[in-house]
Amino acid sequence: VIVAGEPDMLKALQGKVAGVDIRSSQGGPGSATKINIRGASSFFGDNEPLIIVDGVPLSNQQITTSNQTSGGSNYSGGLSSIDPNDIASMSVLKGSAAAAMYGSRASNGVVIIKTKSGSTTSGEKRFGVTLNSSLSFENIANLPEYQNTYGPGFAFKYSNSNGSWGPRFDSMEKIPAWEDYLNAFPELFPEDGMIPYEAVPNNVKDLFQTGHIYDNSVNLSGGNEKSAFNATLSHMKHEGYIPNSGYKRVAMSVGGSTKLGNGINLRGNISYTNTDQKGGMYGENQVSGAASSFARTLFLGRNWDLTKYPYETPDGKPVSTLTSQYDNPLWSWKHNVTTTEADRIIGSIGLDYDVTDWFNISYTIGTNVYSMYRKEVIDIGSRAAEGKGQLTDHKARTVETESTLLLTFEKDFFEDYSVKAILGHNANERKRTETLVVGTEFKVPNIYNLANTKNQVVSGDYYEKRRLMGVFFDLTLGYKSWAFLGFTARNDWSSTLPKNHRSYFYPAVTGSFVFSDAFNLQSNMFNFGKIRVGWAKVGRDADPYYLYNVYALGDPFRGQTITSASSSAGNNNLKPEFTEEVEVGTQLDFFNRRLSLDFTWYNKISTNLIAPVQLPNSSGFVEIYDNFGKIRNRGIEIGLRAVPVEIKDFKWEVGVNFTKNKNEVLELKEGVERIALAGVLTDLA
């Protein structure tokens, strides 16, 4: 991850693991990155894998303030705050069989991250200092292929409008200057307010700049026979290719472990990250009164040279070629701005006790605290907010605490047989608070706080709490280190499900056979061969507050608080979702492991899905969440790795991944023909 020089640890995984789909929501600095493994298995539930950092779960949720219709910015995600410089290792568990060990939240797979501060081990006396520094540049990757023969207008007649349906550029010499520019800066147009009618081939490209990323870190590590420590400090600054966009991250972490004697080992680590993100409005904005710097940017009139002329008057008012349809992007990037400051603290402490050489007791408790403060400004003069200005003040805080107790038995019998059994208990609690206040119509220009707005409305004030408890058992039987059979079972209890369905059980069975060892097939050409099979069933709970009819507090009326019922009816008979998956695969290594092939076929079916069903108006509600539907994901994954060159101090490794996943909705509820997952003018599901 460090070698990749990518400030987002998920983006560094792009193309590295077959079956893992990684996509960025926006191209701006710090923008959220979504990860999906083997397709979507739920209509409305979270389809991202569980992220575990040093034993502590971490949500990759993207907290949005405005949607893509009204504006929308390049909001960051949960993993944007993870410092790649502190990552020691990262592994991806793709199959549902992993869920029995990690709980129902792992139904979409697991990404396990071990940091340097969280993976210290004692050993020989040592002390080390590692410095990393990188500088990289970025430019906008692609733009449409523009024509430069025809200008703006309709039916080959000139008019100041978007598109290129007007006359040829070689058919006219001059046209009237744009009204906004002529009124604001008449001195720029001395020839009777006329300008040349000519194409500007790079008028879109010239709006952008060359971005750069500075990333510096220092790592200290040391230890002796009994203790070890590790500490990392890093600073990253990303200036984007969109003007006035950027992302800063300062991260520090420290961890260590020590042997207390009598088989007891104490370990712990803590990390703190502060991020500061800034960017414009980048949303859809094809509706009236919305704010987006990209409303018309990608299909400007071919003669609109926005970088040649000022984009604002001396008092800050916008100037553009067609004010009624779009904000000048250069003005918008300066004035319509979203700034987000966030802090994340992840800490864990654990105790390991080797009772005997074959029995170990381990307990880990950790917490993850995330706090965010965001200001979203639509400045005076924008076509949005009626031109009067708007400020959205958004605060959010999430606290997640998890504890895990493991009893591990591991012993060999009669030289050829091995047994490993894990009995565990897991407890998880998540709390979230969120407030969102919108102030409209600035009293005084250039002062961006709620006290400077004439009207304030609390558009959101949320509190959410949920708990998930589980017990699990994992048994692995081995024979001669080439045949393995595994059994896993877990039972969870979720606070988001009704009492009669709160408890749900799910098992898994896996097997693997290393035939190259069993039949002694190793040679210079063929080194390793393994076949693996697995079946798993995993349950998943609902989001909070689907069970009962709940009420919300509205705006006061004549001093009295107004309470209104939710548009969703409660359903006290909700059941968990279930996913069954069958997986078959093989791993083959050739030519002293310089060529390897990994192939997997899987078939995953999800049932009992939790989704809304429309209700008749006479019910007094709009919808109710219920269990219905069936989704199938079926596909193959191929990973090919080769080492063309390997000498003493040099190794060149190349890899190719291929994934094919077919995602099908097999069933809906009787009488339900379609479910709207997203619309043209709404966020993508």
Regions found by a protein language model. Name each.
Residues 1-253, 258-267, 273, 346-347, ...:
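Short, small/polar-rich motifs associated with maturation and membrane association
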Residues 3, 48, 249, 255-260, ...:
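Extracellular/periplasmic, surface-exposed regions of secreted and cell-surface proteins
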Residues 384-385:
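N-terminal, polar/charged subdomain of small-to-medium soluble alpha/beta proteins
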Residues 279-281, 287-290, 340:
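Immediate N-terminus of the mature polypeptide
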Residues 146-203, 296-331, 447-458, 462, ...:
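Flexible glycine-rich, low-complexity coil/linker segments exposed to the extracellular/periplasmic environment
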Residues 13, 18, 186, 296, ...:
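Proline-centered flexible-loop/turn and helix-kink motifs
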